[in-house]
Swiss-Prot record:
Oligomeric and partner information: Component of the mitochondrial ribosome small subunit.
Annotated compartments: Mitochondrion
Protein source organism: Arabidopsis thaliana (Mouse-ear cress)
NCBIfam families listed in its UniProt record: PPR
Pfam families named among the record's database cross-references: PPR (PF01535), PPR_2 (PF13041)
Family per record: Belongs to the PPR family. P subfamily.
Residue range covered by the transit peptide: 1-19
First-listed, main subcellular location of the protein, grouped into a coarse class: mitochondrion
InterPro entries: Mito_RNA_Proc_CCM1, Pentatricopeptide_rpt, TPR-like_helical_dom_sf
Protein name per UniProt: Small ribosomal subunit protein mS78 (rPPR3a)
Amino acid sequence: MSSLSRVLRGTFNTCPIRRFSSAATVVSEPTAVTAAISPPQKSLTSLVNGERNPKRIVEKFKKACESERFRTNIAVYDRTVRRLVAAKRLHYVEEILEEQKKYRDMSKEGFAARIISLYGKAGMFENAQKVFEEMPNRDCKRSVLSFNALLSAYRLSKKFDVVEELFNELPGKLSIKPDIVSYNTLIKALCEKDSLPEAVALLDEIENKGLKPDIVTFNTLLLSSYLKGQFELGEEIWAKMVEKNVAIDIRTYNARLLGLANEAKSKELVNLFGELKASGLKPDVFSFNAMIRGSINEGKMDEAEAWYKEIVKHGYRPDKATFALLLPAMCKAGDFESAIELFKETFSKRYLVGQTTLQQLVDELVKGSKREEAEEIVKIAKTNDFLKLKLNLPSQEE
């Protein structure tokens, strides 16, 4: 049975009777007395955030959830789920989120939608779907809020076809009217499944439904166009934003900077960067990475290195993408000395750099008869006290 069929079946086979999960007894809300003697929310949050052992994180989180105030802390829920996902402990994600069903908060749509979203961030779409199906049993209404959370959960789980199916089927079944957030989620899903033309076509549908495309709508389409090499389409979307007086933000500028960089349009790129600064917005590391990319694409390594220095001058730290651009480009240009110095800087200043990027550096050094230097990099990557990486040293024959 398809995911959509299971959702629809669950949607219409649940009875709207006040019933809570049998997995746990419903916990009543704290009285004024118990609230007064409960640990402060800040200390509970610190206990959870400060723990590093996944099992202990779960234990402390579940204990902290007994506090009503703690259960309103969206950030700590999000952070805890992300940490458990990073540790590949999805069963622990399920444990802490299923624990929430014993609280009456689950009868509030906002709280239920949050749990659906968290399951989505963990890629656990079936659990998200189950929470959505169970909402009527908890006398919890399902409006566009929880509908959007479900769409997002499937998108984050990369079930793009299901997002499209749910968007087309559920609103009519549940008497829900999709809003601009619904459309934005669908557009993101279509872009991520390489259906850019269908995503762009939704602009007309949005307006025909009496809705107004917002900055998220346009930024999604703009970035997807430039990333997929559809430069002219990206320029059309940019022009439409200007025509409709959409308030352009830093992400809009960064998307177009990337598009111009990929096309090696240096003059337009520099002009747009100047326009960005004149607008009152502050360029960020993504802006500078685009400028670095543009310089590299035109073979101007001196300019690329100058833009790199601007990142720190503007109060930012270079990211993995910065080094993924610069290190291979330096090697390609035969400037191994600069590449080695940049590598050393990443570790001395504790900048994050990807393992794939460093492996490329090692490979290029060996090809360039710099085996001794390559060996040093492999050793530093393995023995440093910041970011231990296992790099492979190519054999002499390779």
